[in-house]
Amino acid sequence: MTVTKTPLLDTVRDASDVRRLPEEKLSQLADELRAETISAVSVTGGHLGAGLGVVELTVALHHVFNTPHDRLIWDVGHQCYPHKILTGRRDRIRTLRQGGGLSGFTRRSESEYDPFGAAHSSTSISAGLGMAVARDLSGGDRNVIAVIGDGAMSAGMAYEAMNNAGAMDSRLIVILNDNDMSIAPPTGAMSAYLARLISGRTYLSLREIGKQLAGHLPKFVKDGAAKAEEFARGFWTGGTLFEEMGFYYVGPIDGHNLEHLLPVLKNVRDAKTGPILVHVVTQKGKGYPPAEASADKYHGVVKFDVVTGAQVKAKSNAPSYTRVFAETLIDEARRDDKVVAITAAMPSGTGLDLFGQAFPQRTFDVGIAEQHAVTFAAGLAAEGYRPFCALYSTFLQRGYDQVVHDVALQGLPVRFAIDRAGLVGADGATHAGAFDLAMLTCLPGFTVMAPADEAELTHMIATAVGHDAGPIAFRFPRGEGVGVERPEKGERLPIGKGRVVREGQDIAFLSLGTRLAACLDVAERLSSLGISATVADARFAKPIDRELIAHLARTHAALVVVEEGSVGGFGSQVLQFLSDEGLMDGGLKVRALTLPDTYIDHDTPAAQLAEAGLDADGIYKRALALVQPAERRGAVATKRA
């Protein structure tokens, strides 16, 4: 492997060293920073394209602003790797997303240079405004800078924050990182000149003087002058939308040209006016040809060869659950023209890119707008369509009020395909699908399913298509299936009914979802000790199979309920039923194994499951504490009636 020399970057311990560098050295620093980012991510995998697109911007921000005293907030955090390298974390950059290593996102507990944690989209302006107001209340003078991408600007939260900031006239700097040129491209030297001019003190001072003088003029003259300035600046800069929200707009400027960036950032740093938006245009994957040529493939990457760009992907033993979902939904849609699909800016992540290729008129990408996605689906359901709202579990949280108010309360048959349920590995706690079971099983009238394998997922999709009695959800994990044979066509499952997959006498395991394989492993281990175990596949978290659970409780000495979800989910439903029916009064030993009441950091999925006690070893240990081999015969003899 070729090692790129980085003599200037080697002198940078933290951002204070970046500020001490002369401006003529910053281009070299950016080049070396880009090379180091590529080298590090080739080893660890992670988000590459976004970080390469903000290298010059990152250098410029840390050179101009006094971080960490000045608060620099990165929206989402996909682009934060260069920032981490410049802020004292270069020595650990090759531990990104590894167990015990650096987070793939900004994180308050990791560095004082990360004033606000991120991973979900469109939060930076709200957080920045809160910090700006706190500064003003405290009589401080620090700058607050929020860097947000144009994609994140599709979320309503960003505009809610901008509307609030404009109304408060708080001194806040928003950097709009436009890396899709979806708003407006820069127009070369004239664009840079205008941006520098209108962000400068002279123009701003004259503007303030003009406002004061206009205050003494008749209202129609004052309003006319304001509209004339707005028109002139909007004509040249395209920032009328942001001006209407109360922001002073500067740009667009070339985000890869330090000669353009530095003077503008200095001007806005020194401005004492209200909120300012600087529109910076960048290119995803800048400086790395494979990423420039295919931005979507290099947004998130596994380990790759730096020279060729080839990503090292392990051969799959089975299709991913996401692909099974997509292919099955396509089959169902061929039979039912009322089936439609909705995604919130995650078509490839949810598999709906495949559905969209087959049914472009029945596929809807609503942008980063989960609240809207859910209620949009509710509207479709109200008109007799069968909408599948495909969301990651972690992003379902963003639309929860709509799930309750617009779907559940009205009993509308929206189908929720909940991907990335449970632990997700390298993306860590911010993306873990821990809470969907607790969120949904508490809602009256909701049906919630979880497949043990890809065959069951196929059946659950068919079940959801045919379920018009109310809202229904099915959750499935990240990654590959277990390799079972998939049916050619899904069959509708009886609602609220599980199945017994192994018969025993002493201890019963009731598994929801893909922990079933681990429970079967544990049952086999216990068998070698003379302990007979029943293993049941719950299939439904709501409604629970009351008949099956009562049978397990009455015919076994111990019952272990297993789910890859937080406290308050399926296990809580089972315990409530056992309590209501008095099924624990005769001495039944019950344990509900869930994710622990904490946040599990990024690591391999296997390590995360072990930490949670939900791998086969953890389940086995808990089971042995309930039924020892010597107790087996006595337990069978005292079965409860």
From Swiss-Prot:
HAMAP family, alphabetized: DXP_synth
Reaction(s) this enzyme catalyzes, per UniProt: D-glyceraldehyde 3-phosphate + pyruvate + H(+) = 1-deoxy-D-xylulose 5-phosphate + CO2
Cofactor note: Binds 1 Mg(2+) ion per subunit.
EC number(s) reported in the record: 2.2.1.7
Pathway(s): Metabolic intermediate biosynthesis; 1-deoxy-D-xylulose 5-phosphate biosynthesis; 1-deoxy-D-xylulose 5-phosphate from D-glyceraldehyde 3-phosphate and pyruvate: step 1/1
Any one GO molecular-function label of the UniProt entry: 1-deoxy-D-xylulose-5-phosphate synthase activity
Subunit structure: Homodimer.
Domain of life of the native organism: Bacteria
Described function: Catalyzes the acyloin condensation reaction between C atoms 2 and 3 of pyruvate and glyceraldehyde 3-phosphate to yield 1-deoxy-D-xylulose-5-phosphate (DXP).
Chain positions recorded as thiamine diphosphate binding sites: 78, 119-121, 151-152, 179, 288, 370
Cofactor: Mg(2+); thiamine diphosphate
Organism annotation: Azorhizobium caulinodans (strain ATCC 43989 / DSM 5975 / JCM 20966 / LMG 6465 / NBRC 14845 / NCIMB 13405 / ORS 571)
One GO process term, biological-process aspect: glyceraldehyde-3-phosphate metabolic process
Family to which the UniProt record says this protein belongs: Belongs to the transketolase family. DXPS subfamily.
Family annotation (InterPro entries): Dxylulose-5-P_synthase, THDP-binding, Transketo_C/PFOR_II, Transketolase-like_Pyr-bd, Transketolase_C, Transketolase_CS
UniProt gene name: dxs
Keywords linked to the UniProt accession: Isoprene biosynthesis, Magnesium, Metal-binding, Thiamine biosynthesis, Thiamine pyrophosphate, Transferase
Protein name from the UniProt record: 1-deoxy-D-xylulose-5-phosphate synthase
Chain positions recorded as Mg(2+) binding sites: 150, 179
